[in-house]
Amino acid sequence: MITHFRQAIEETLPWLSSFGADPAGGMTRLLYSPEWLETQQQFKKRMAASGLETRFDEVGNLYGRLNGTEYPQEVVLSGSHIDTVVNGGNLDGQFGALAAWLAIDWLKTQYGAPLRTVEVVAMAEEEGSRFPYVFWGSKNIFGLANPDDVRNICDAKGNSFVDAMKACGFTLPNAPLTPRQDIKAFVELHIEQGCVLESNGQSIGVVNAIVGQRRYTVTLNGESNHAGTTPMGYRRDTVYAFSRICHQSVEKAKRMGDPLVLTFGKVEPRPNTVNVVPGKTTFTIDCRHTDAAVLRDFTQQLENDMRAICDEMDIGIDIDLWMDEEPVPMNKELVATLTELCEREKLNYRVMHSGAGHDAQIFAPRVPTCMIFIPSINGISHNPAERTNITDLAEGVKTLALMLYQLAWQK
């Protein structure tokens, strides 16, 4: 089984990765670009040639379907997104779609038609790399995407969402799509995009939750002044205030420990010149945890600490909480089924959370959902150096195939 999947991956992954490949390495496959369209069209042809019924929905999500014999109205869905970040790797997203097809193709050959219908999905978009909108693919599956939210947006080059969509043969709907009611389970295989599995020598991650996230933009207002003539005790230095906030907050996060993570990712001092005390500094905060209450309490304390530091230093502060996403648990029964499968197959696995967002978080509140992680070498992703050992790739497809067998081929 592993040998079969290794060979299948070695043949199909370079093929699929050729669409949108950058000459200097990596991949760029943005929503409704020519590269995106070619990928979806070629993947559609390949799935059709293997015996699956293929179709696009109204926004470009691609499906490959194998009808069930006893419960054709019940769909077990597997796949991931087909788009990439700019100059990304060839595993994030697309390997989940490819793996679903390889797994279903093998199951069809071994066992014939399933009892329940199985479908591969290559979702149109997840990354938000071209337009300021994320999860366009999965949100449309459940009627969660409002066309008005994208009707007037453009990419960095001024191309409108609507025009890009039309160029690929799709038309923006006038209203949200009708939610699918036939999906009974969703299984997403994905690279970990972190270093936990590799660091522990494990090949499979059973995901039990996707972290909640809170993101802020914070602006500190002090006073710009001469760097040579303003004594230290008379300064309202916003970079100094930021440095105190950053140090204190990161130390608290370290004491809190896993799974809490805290990142000060973007810092913009003004006027940002060598001989002026910075009178304004804007920075971002990204905080994540699997427990909503812990995340809320930690960030509330962080806000209080920032205000206290600024009050002490006579610095004005504006705190904008612009993302507040709850943690998303995976389906307990599917997590248990997947864990039992790993035990039975004697796989080297761990139950873990996902520190990144995935399409599965759109599915999980609506249909039973689980995720399978495979290792990322050196924890690198969103990078041309994104890699996973071929044996781990094959182990992931095998695990997915066994899970789909239980869900669709057994009663």
Curated annotation (Swiss-Prot):
**Activity regulation information from UniProt:** Sulfate could be an allosteric effector of the enzyme that is responsible for stabilizing substrate binding. In addition, this anion effector may act as a counterion during enzyme-mediated catalysis.
Annotated Zn(2+) 2 binding sites: D92, E127, H382
CDD domains on file: M20_bAS
Instruction: Explain what induces or represses this protein's expression.
Output: By glyoxylate and allantoin under anaerobic conditions.
- List cystine links: none
Cellular component (GO) terms are: cytoplasm
**Keyword Hydrolase among UniProt keywords:** yes
Does this entry carry the keyword Hydrolase? yes
Q: Which UniProt keywords apply?
A: Cytoplasm, Hydrolase, Metal-binding, Purine metabolism, Zinc
Q: How does it assemble?
A: Homodimer.
Q: What does this protein do?
A: Involved in the anaerobic nitrogen utilization via the assimilation of allantoin. Catalyzes specifically the hydrolysis of allantoate to yield CO2, NH3 and S-ureidoglycine, which is unstable and readily undergoes a second deamination by S-ureidoglycine aminohydrolase AllE to yield S-ureidoglycolate and NH3. In vivo, the spontaneous release of S-ureidoglycolate and ammonia from S-ureidoglycine appears to be too slow to sustain an efficient flux of nitrogen.
> What name goes with this protein?
Allantoate amidohydrolase
Q: Which organism is the protein's source?
A: Escherichia coli (strain K12)
What is the organism lineage in this UniProt record?
Bacteria, Pseudomonadati, Pseudomonadota, Gammaproteobacteria, Enterobacterales
